[in-house]
């Protein structure tokens, strides 16, 4: 533990500039430090050889660099990899690397556990422990890049791991700004998708603060079904949620994504599909249809392939783009709704 020293990876460029100035050093040193942290992946100030020894000594005295530690990696038969990270306080989170034809997609977490209580989600079973710091969000990407030193790179980032990103808004926003900064990880905002259960005021705030891709975990065409599956809907019902979606800025040809987990006998009938079409009328969007991924002691079942295809065909008939998403990593509990760092934590 680094008691009383600030983790410099929790700081923005402006904060590092202020910090460096307080040490009597030139502000441009902050940009050098950012480059070392994110472009070079420096794990210590001693690696930052463009800084004088005196500056490095000062930084070592006042600050530290801490990153999540890879505790375990599991590989699925389809190539998906689930990474268990140990944090400084011995909490555990999970990230997922999903292989594409020419690159990787990184699915990262924003909280230790989750308090949203969605009934179809394994993460909800472990409860909520705490929010992740900016360094713990960006640190997942840095460590995943270390893990993939050669070959295809990480090109896309989805904030769909453990936790509700908009319930950890300030830290998530700060992390995204570091991820997209020229002095940070340098990702385009077009390559980042944030998934939310639907905290409506924060969707509106996100639209004012950033321009990233937004995915809504919808999962039901009516308030009664959605409130049963997702307690957040009792506070932010569908009419208010969809109004926020209609107002969300989508430059160019971007579209909102609605994620719809198909659960047998709950939300997957042809009548549900017809209601969904009416609900989303007028919103520029696409739908990701996801077969419910079963987990230990879950109360729900995966629908048949026939049910899934029939649901998709109704959406397509109404001119919606509806993609049936392959459930990657199901055999290692790395698929949608299956992450739970606690499950592996107890075995370490």
Curated annotation (Swiss-Prot):
It comes from the Bacteria. InterPro entries: Aldolase_TIM, Methyltransferase_A, RlmN_N, RNA_MTrfase_RlmN, rRNA_lsu_MTrfase_RlmN/Cfr, rSAM. Its main location: cytoplasm. Disulfide bonds join 107-336. Its EC number is 2.1.1.192. [4Fe-4S] cluster binds at residues 114, 118, 121. It is an enzyme of class 2 (transferase). It is found in: Cytoplasm. Its cofactor is [4Fe-4S] cluster. The active site is at residues 94, 336. It catalyses: adenosine(2503) in 23S rRNA + 2 reduced [2Fe-2S]-[ferredoxin] + 2 S-adenosyl-L-methionine = 2-methyladenosine(2503) in 23S rRNA + 5'-deoxyadenosine + L-methionine + 2 oxidized [2Fe-2S]-[ferredoxin] + S-adenosyl-L-homocysteine; adenosine(37) in tRNA + 2 reduced [2Fe-2S]-[ferredoxin] + 2 S-adenosyl-L-methionine = 2-methyladenosine(37) in tRNA + 5'-deoxyadenosine + L-methionine + 2 oxidized [2Fe-2S]-[ferredoxin] + S-adenosyl-L-homocysteine. Keywords: 4Fe-4S, Cytoplasm, Disulfide bond, Iron, Iron-sulfur, Metal-binding, Methyltransferase, rRNA processing, S-adenosyl-L-methionine, Transferase, tRNA processing. Belongs to the radical SAM superfamily. RlmN family. Specifically methylates position 2 of adenine 2503 in 23S rRNA and position 2 of adenine 37 in tRNAs. m2A2503 modification seems to play a crucial role in the proofreading step occurring at the peptidyl transferase center and thus would serve to optimize ribosomal fidelity. This is Dual-specificity RNA methyltransferase RlmN. The gene is rlmN.
């Amino acid at each position: 533990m680094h008691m009383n020293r600030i983790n410099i990876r929790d700081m923005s460029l402006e904060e590092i500039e202020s910090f460096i100035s307080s040490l009597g050093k030139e502000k441009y040193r902050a940009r050098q430090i950012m480059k070392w942290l994110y472009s070079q992946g420096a794990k210590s100030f001693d690696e930052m050889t463009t800084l004088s020894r005196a500056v490095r000594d000062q930084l070592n005295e006042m600050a530290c660099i801490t990153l999540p530690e890879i505790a375990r990696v599991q590989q699925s038969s389809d190539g998906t990899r689930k990474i268990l990270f140990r944090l400084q306080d011995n909490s555990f989170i999970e990230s997922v690397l999903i292989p594409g034809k020419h690159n990787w997609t990184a699915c990262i977490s924003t909280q230790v556990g989750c308090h949203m209580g969605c009934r179809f989600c394994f993460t909800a079973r472990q409860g909520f422990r705490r929010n992740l710091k900016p360094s713990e969000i960006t640190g997942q990407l840095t460590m995943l890049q270390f893990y993939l030193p050669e070959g295809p790179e990480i090109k896309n980032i989805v904030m769909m791991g453990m936790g509700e990103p908009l319930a950890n808004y300030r830290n998530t926003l700060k992390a995204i700004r570091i991820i997209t900064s020229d002095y940070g990880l340098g990702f385009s905002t077009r390559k980042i998708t944030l998934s939310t259960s639907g905290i409506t005021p924060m969707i509106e705030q996100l639209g004012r603060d950033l321009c990233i891709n937004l995915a809504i975990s919808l999962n039901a065409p009516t308030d009664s079904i959605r409130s049963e599956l997702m307690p957040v809907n009792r506070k932010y019902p569908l009419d208010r949620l969809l109004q926020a979606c209609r107002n969300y800025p989508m430059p160019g040809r971007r579209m909102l994504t609605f994620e719809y987990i198909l659960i047998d006998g709950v939300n997957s009938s042809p009548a549900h599909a017809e209601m969904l079409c009416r609900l989303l009328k007028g919103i520029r969007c696409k739908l990701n249809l996801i077969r419910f991924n079963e987990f230990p002691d879950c109360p729900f079942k995966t629908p048949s392939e026939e049910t899934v295809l029939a649901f998709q065909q109704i959406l397509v008939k109404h001119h919606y783009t509806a993609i049936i998403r392959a459930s990657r990593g199901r055999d290692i509990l790395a698929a949608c709704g299956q992450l739970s760092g606690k499950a592996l934590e107890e075995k370490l």
